[in-house]
């Protein structure tokens, strides 16, 4: 028995306005926030540590997402909807893939760098040299550039395109979520162990200098919670939606996910580019101090 599935593939006027306003504000925040971080990184020599170079690479990816991907997404969802077989849609898909890959791969690099810094503090400078840092960053951007070619090499058959997105979803979401979660799980364990050790030392020696270290560790634990929470909130819906769309046999459900649900899921993922500077950078004391020096009128 055929069940009719009737819905409008275009967003309603109210939904279009809300989505446009949402992506405009988050895109502007991503551009301004990440541009400010990159400017501070460029102007302040003490900020150019190896760890901060990974953060700078992440900021470049988030800056490009706010500058290019957000406006393009507003255009195709609100104003002009390209045909499924058009070259324009392929180009838009390539831009989306490139931006998403660059963001999530750089997030993985930041997470792995922090894991090594906390897990192996005395060997960190030997493991993560400046040369290796640049090599990893270059590899991230080259691999991000390579992945969009998958959209060029396949035809416009809906089933083939769906299989491509399903495969990419595991590269973009499953792999990074696993890496980030494992890294911050081990960081959390290490920080908790250090905090307990500091607490014991404080009770035994009543030494006042253990208090700042304890507070620093508590702040690190809070940062871990923010990082994992925002990452999972931003990207997990994309993975779930892609998987459900691929495995379901209900054509009506698949179309509703693609045309009704996906625009909002994509907007959530793009919002992370505006949030990342606040989590990864402005919780960093050195960056906050540089911000106060250069933008004292704003602070």
Q: Which functions belong to the PLM regions below?
A:
Residues 67, 71, 146-149, 222-244, ...:
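Hydrophobic alpha-helical segments of membrane proteins
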Residues 75-78, 95, 99-109, 116-161, ...:
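Fourth transmembrane helix
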Residues 38-41, 70-77, 81, 148-159, ...:
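Transmembrane helix-loop junctions and nearby membrane-interface residues
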Residues 8-16, 44-48, 81-83, 125-129, ...:
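Helix-boundary and loop/linker segments of multi-pass membrane transporters
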Residues 12-24, 50-110, 117-125, 162-166, ...:
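Extracellular TM2-ECL1-early TM3 structural module of rhodopsin-like
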Residues 1-36:
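Extracellular N-terminal segment of 7TM GPCRs
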Residues 179-183, 230-243, 260-299:
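Seventh transmembrane helix
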Residues 60-61, 189-238:
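Intracellular effector-coupling site of seven-transmembrane GPCRs
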């Amino acid at each position: 028995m055929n069940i009719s599935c009737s819905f409008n593939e275009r967003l309603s006027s109210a939904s279009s306005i809300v989505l446009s306003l949402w992506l405009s504000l988050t895109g502007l925040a991503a551009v301004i926030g990440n541009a400010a971080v990159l400017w501070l990184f460029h102007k302040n020599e003490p900020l150019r540590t190896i760890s901060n170079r990974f953060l700078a690479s992440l900021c470049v990816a988030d800056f490009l997402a706010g500058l290019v991907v957000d406006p393009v997404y507003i255009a195709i969802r609100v104003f002009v909807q390209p045909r499924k077989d058009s070259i324009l849609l392929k180009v838009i898909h390539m831009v989306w893939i490139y931006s998403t890959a660059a963001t999530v791969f750089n997030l993985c690099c930041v997470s792995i760098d922090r894991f090594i810094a906390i897990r192996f503090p005395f060997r960190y400078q030997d493991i993560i040299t400046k040369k290796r840092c640049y090599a990893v960053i270059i590899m991230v951007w080259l691999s991000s550039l390579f992945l969009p070619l998958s959209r060029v090499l396949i035809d416009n058959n809906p089933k083939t395109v769906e299989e491509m997105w399903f495969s990419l979803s595991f590269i973009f979401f499953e792999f990074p979520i696993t890496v980030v979660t494992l890294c911050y799980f081990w960081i959390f364990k290490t920080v908790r162990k250090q905090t307990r050790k500091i607490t014991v030392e404080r009770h035994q020696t009543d030494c006042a200098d253990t208090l700042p270290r304890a507070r620093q560790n508590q702040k690190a634990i809070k940062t871990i919670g923010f990082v994992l929470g925002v990452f999972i909130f931003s990207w997990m819906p994309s993975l779930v939606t892609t998987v459900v769309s691929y495995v379901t046999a209900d054509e009506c459900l698949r179309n509703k996910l693609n045309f009704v649900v996906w625009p909002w899921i994509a907007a959530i993922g793009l919002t992370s580019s505006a949030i990342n500077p606040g989590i990864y950078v402005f919780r960093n004391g050195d960056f906050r101090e540089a911000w106060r020096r250069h933008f004292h009128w704003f602070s």
